[in-house]
Amino acid sequence: MSSVTQLFKNNPVNRDRIIPLDFTNTKTLPDSHVWSKPEPETTSGPIPVISLSNPEEHGLLRQACEEWGVFHITDHGVSHSLLHNVDCQMKRLFSLPMHRKILAVRSPDESTGYGVVRISMFYDKLMWSEGFSVMGSSLRRHATLLWPDDHAEFCNVMEEYQKAMDDLSHRLISMLMGSLGLTHEDLGWLVPDKTGSGTDSIQSFLQLNSYPVCPDPHLAMGLAPHTDSSLLTILYQGNIPGLEIESPQEEGSRWIGVEPIEGSLVVIMGDLSHIISNGQFRSTMHRAVVNKTHHRVSAAYFAGPPKNLQIGPLTSDKNHPPIYRRLIWEEYLAAKATHFNKALTLFRC
């Protein structure tokens, strides 16, 4: 059982907080979805763009992690046709009528299936979004509920995408951890698991997100501000803007829009990378906003360390003592499930 699966079993969510609003039949913004708190100013910013095919740009990865905690990658090896197919299948999924989608609704103690994002439990107001979580064999089980006789194409596309993300995440984590001084021997756990046991490989899951057209986007929130609990997140955001990050220079006072770049993917550093780098890599606060004219979809792939692997700061020395204690991912996920964006502070030395 993966750390993420165990987390959901140990921290079940009230079923009333799982099923999203039927957005198709909602013409005005209900009070349950009105976020009245004034939001900080949003601007555009020079988010780093790094080509993975250019060795001269690999040195920019660490700088991007330290200064931004988020960056675009191009020439990543994931074909445009696969990204297009993923986009089409997400829209196919989320365009289903509500009575069909709830056939695959996740149970209160389950980590996969259809429903609202888990972080909604930390807010009084609801978010203008819906999601579909995928992990392992759950994909075909839930897809069969949605399309009893026509699920093969959806499953094949998502399985191909998960495999591409597995390969890309291994490559990225190796490069990023290498920039902190780790050797190939240190990163033995990054070798892709060929046995199917999952004991010598990263843990991962895929979150498909839908942000429907909103009647009053200035008062709504697609995805509330948060950091990710992973090592890193690889995000496909299509060609419609919506992702915003907290300004590294003006935290809490300004948001920066991450404009889509055709064919690129966005990498967001997670809390575990912040811990491993002893605070050098930023775990960036980010959110998703909605709009009045376009239905936006995104696919977020979360990568974490193997189950029961202890991690801790790797770059500490006598001049820079460790600021976080060692932990396993399951332990951190449990803290995040209770303390949300304050979880990092619990692991300080």
UniProtKB/Swiss-Prot annotation:
Protein name per the record: Gibberellin 3-beta-dioxygenase 3
Free-text function comment from the UniProt entry: Converts the inactive gibberellin (GA) precursors GA9 and GA20 in the bioactives gibberellins GA4 and GA1. Involved in the production of bioactive GA for reproductive development.
EC class of the enzyme, as a word: oxidoreductase
Domain (Fe2OG dioxygenase) ranges: 201-305
Family as reported in the entry's similarity comment: Belongs to the iron/ascorbate-dependent oxidoreductase family. GA3OX subfamily.
Record field: catalytic activity: gibberellin A20 + 2-oxoglutarate + O2 = gibberellin A1 + succinate + CO2
UniProt-listed Pfam families: 2OG-FeII_Oxy, DIOX_N
Tissue/organ expression: Expressed in flower clusters and siliques.
GO BP field: gibberellin biosynthetic process
Pathway assigned in UniProt: Plant hormone biosynthesis; gibberellin biosynthesis
Entries under InterPro entries matching the protein: DIOX_N, IPNS-like_FE2OG_OXY, IPNS-like_sf, Iron_ascorbate_oxido_reductase, Oxoglu/Fe-dep_dioxygenase_dom
Known EC number: 1.14.11.15
Organism: Arabidopsis thaliana (Mouse-ear cress)
GO MF annotations, alphabetized: gibberellin 3-beta-dioxygenase activity; metal ion binding
UniProt-annotated binding residues for Fe cation: 226, 228, 286
Record's keyword terms, sorted: Dioxygenase, Iron, Metal-binding, Oxidoreductase
Active site: 296
Reported cofactor(s): L-ascorbate; Fe cation
